[in-house]
Amino acid sequence: MKITTIAKTSLALGLLTTGVITTTTQAANATTPSSTKVEAPQSTPPSTKIEAPQSKPNATTPPSTKVEAPQQTANATTPPSTKVTTPPSTNTPQPMQSTKSDTPQSPTTKQVPTEINPKFKDLRAYYTKPSLEFKNEIGIILKKWTTIRFMNVVPDYFIYKIALVGKDDKKYGEGVHRNVDVFVVLEENNYNLEKYSVGGITKSNSKKVDHKAGVRITKEDNKGTISHDVSEFKITKEQISLKELDFKLRKQLIEKNNLYGNVGSGKIVIKMKNGGKYTFELHKKLQENRMADVIDGTNIDNIEVNIK
């Protein structure tokens, strides 16, 4: 653990001295294709070796013409495939069957989108994205080089640029910030950044947290039928951002209650033990400036959801 911290700290100092993150991103991204280039030549030699014995029997023209002639007539429909899969020629019908077995599964996945109201398509696509959670990381903030500032988080030597919006812009100054947790959802941006996210920065836990908040759900479908459901939401952080809370709750509602199917309006109300509350409106994405807001996760009392 100490070696990892030292490595990340040295990398942080390197970023601060150079002041150029773009070069680091190129270096980080350059490492990934190198691995694919090393594996690529390993896959090509066996293919050339398979073709090489085919060229040798061709040198003896009399026997080769007699053997190749029936092979071409049998596989005349797919001549290129016979050259690639000549050894497992008996198994060639099996991949054809596997592709057919996949096709009946595709209609089942297509049945879900047909039930989705087009006006909820973008919201459903966003809140079903994969998310990432980085804990006890080092955040590096350099001088502003565009309209907004970024915290650079470097887990596994890949740089994620977290936009400092809302309260984060004044909360975090330039330099190195330790013991940082970040909840990441990659988003489109105008900066040509592949690993870009907004808000979701919190302080790492000082102790273990295992808190569960009850969730009461009332749903009215497009036919006016009202249903009720009860579930719970697990919280493992002392501090939790509204970005993480909003994203995880909506994703849970999509999976269990078909949010953004035929209905996608309503609200989520987070009720605190001290009487405060926070509201998420389901008909729109959480505002970017609120993605930086942080609340006490252990102080959440219960959550009420109304879907209509």
Curated annotation (Swiss-Prot):
Cellular component per GO, a single term: extracellular region
Signal peptide: 1-30
Ranges where the record places region Disordered: 28-117
Record keywords, A-Z: Secreted, Signal, Virulence
Organism domain of life: Bacteria
Subcellular location: Secreted
InterPro entries reported for this sequence: Enterotoxin, SSL_OB, Staph/Strept_toxin_CS, Staph_exotoxin, SuperAg_toxin_C, Superantigen_bac, Toxin_b-grasp_Staph/Strep
Sialyl Lewis X-binding: annotated segments: 180-278
Entry-linked Pfam families: SSL_OB, Stap_Strp_tox_C
Composition bias, Low complexity: 77-93
Record Gene3D superfamilies: 2.40.50.110, 3.10.20.120
Polar residues bias: start-end ranges: 33-47, 55-76, 94-114
Record remark on domains: The C-terminal domain contains a V-shape binding site for sialyl Lewis X.
Protein task: Secreted protein that plays a role in immune innate response inhibition by interfering with host TLR2-mediated pathway.
Similarity section: Belongs to the staphylococcal/streptococcal toxin family.
Name this polypeptide is given: Staphylococcal superantigen-like 4
Designated gene of the protein: ssl4
